[in-house]
Amino acid sequence: MKFSTAVTTLISSGAIVSALPHVDVHQEDAHQHKRAVAYKYVYETVVVDSDGHTVTPAASEVATAATSAIITTSVLAPTSSAAAADSSASIAVSSAALAKNEKISDAAASATASTSQGASSSSSSSSATSTLESSSVSSSSEEAAPTSTVVSTSSATQSSASSATKSSTSSTSPSTSTSTSTSSTSSSSSSSSSSSSSSSGSGSIYGDLADFSGPSEKFQDGTIPCDKFPSGQGVISIDWIGEGGWSGVENTDTSTGGSCKEGSYCSYSCQPGMSKTQWPSDQPSDGRSVGGLLCKNGYLYRSNTDADYLCEWGVEAAYVVSKLSKGVAICRTDYPGTENMVIPTYVEGGSSLPLTVVDQDTYFTWEGKKTSAQYYVNNAGVSVEDGCIWGTSGSGIGNWAPLNFGAGSTGGVTYLSLIPNPNNSDALNYNVKIVAADDSSNVIGECVYENGEFSGGADGCTVSVTSGKAHFVLYN
C-alpha cells in the first residue's frame, strides 16, 4: 500500500481556540487564542507492506519559512501546529492535525480499500514544518489541502468525587458498523470489562475502572507478548482500525500502522477521563512524537519506567452531558504518537462521561512545551467505529467532523474550548455549551455553539474553570 507525506509550512496568527501542541499560548481575558494558516505542500510517496514496513523509503523534504521558530514533524499522521496570543497566563497547547490533505486522504482510502486498516493514518503520513509568526488571520490552502491548525487551551489538577454516571446503556455496544475508511467490519463491545489484569481481549470502550478510581495493578515489563493486547486497568482496545487493539503503531523505519512488532512503539487508548503514561523521554529530533509500549525481544516493555501503571486519571474538571436521544462519538487524538483520532469518549443519548482534562504541569512536553488534549466531535448518530478514524474530504467524520473540543489544566485552572474545524464549516446536528456543573463550581466566561455559530465569534470560545467542574452539554 502507498501513503503520501506532506511537508507543510504554516505561519501562525489570527484568533482561535483549540488543542494543539508545540507552541506556547497566552490566555487573554476573552479566552481567545491566535492562529493563522498559510500552507505550502511538497508531496512524496512511501510504500509499505501490510505490516507497515517501508518498502521504498522516502527522503523527507522540509519546507521552510522566514520566521524564528521552525518545527519539523515527519512521517506520521498529518500534523500542524500554530498559536499565539497576548495575556497574563501562559499556556501551551497540545498538537494535533485538524485537517487532512484531500489527496492524501483519498489516496490512502483507495490504497487501503482491501485492507483492514481502519485508520487511514495507518496508511498515510505527513511531515509538517510549522513556523510561528504574529500577524492577522491568514488562511490559504493550495492543492485543496486543508491540513490546518487549531489551538486549544490547557489545564489544572483538581480532583473530587465524580457524581456523573458512566452510561445509562453501558452494557450496550455502540453500533457495529463498517468504517468508511476501512473495508473491514468490526464491533466495539461495550459490556463490562472482564479482567482488570487481562493481557488480551478488547473489553469495553468505557473501561474497567470506576471514574477516578484506581488503577491498582502495576504493569509488569517483559511478561506480555507483543501480539497480545494488555487491556484492563483502564486500558481499552481499539478494535475498529485493524491494529490488534492498539491505537497506533510506530515502526523502526518511521512508518506507522500494522501489528505491534519488534522495535515498534505500540500506543494504546485509556478509558474516558484517563490518559496513557507511556512515551520515551528521548523523542525523535525530527519533530515526530513517539508514544506507547516498546516491543522488545518479543515482549512489551514500558517506555516510561517512572509510571507503574499504563493509564492515569486527568483533572476531574469536565464531563460531557448528553440531552440527546442518539449517541455522540468524541474522538481524542493519540498524542504523543501517531495522532490518530481514535481514542473514544462515546456518550450514549441521555448519559454522561468524564472528558479527559490533561494536567499540563505533569504530562508530556514537546521540546519543553506543555501539551493538552484535543477532540474531534462527530454528529449525533455516528458510531464510534465510523467516527473515531481518519476521515476523507466531505465525509464529515473523524478529522473532518464539524467541531473540536480542547481541554487542559495548568496552575490550578482548567481551560475548556469549543473550536471550529477548518476542514468542515458545516454545523453539527446539535448544539453544545460549556456551563458550571453546579452552584459550587466557578466557570469564567461564556462558551456556546448553537446552530453552527460560536458565542465567541467565528474562531470559537474558551472558558476557565477555577473550582469545581464544568459540563459540555449536548442539546437540540
UniProtKB/Swiss-Prot annotation:
Glycans are attached at residue 423. Its main location: secreted. One of its GO terms (cellular component) is cell surface. Disruption phenotype: Leads to increased resistance to zymolyase treatment. Involved in the remodeling of the cell wall during the various phases of yeast culture development and under various environmental conditions. Required for the maintenance of the CLB5 kinase activity. Present with 1800 molecules/cell in log phase SD medium. This is Probable secreted beta-glucosidase SIM1. It comes from Saccharomyces cerevisiae (strain ATCC 204508 / S288c) (Baker's yeast).
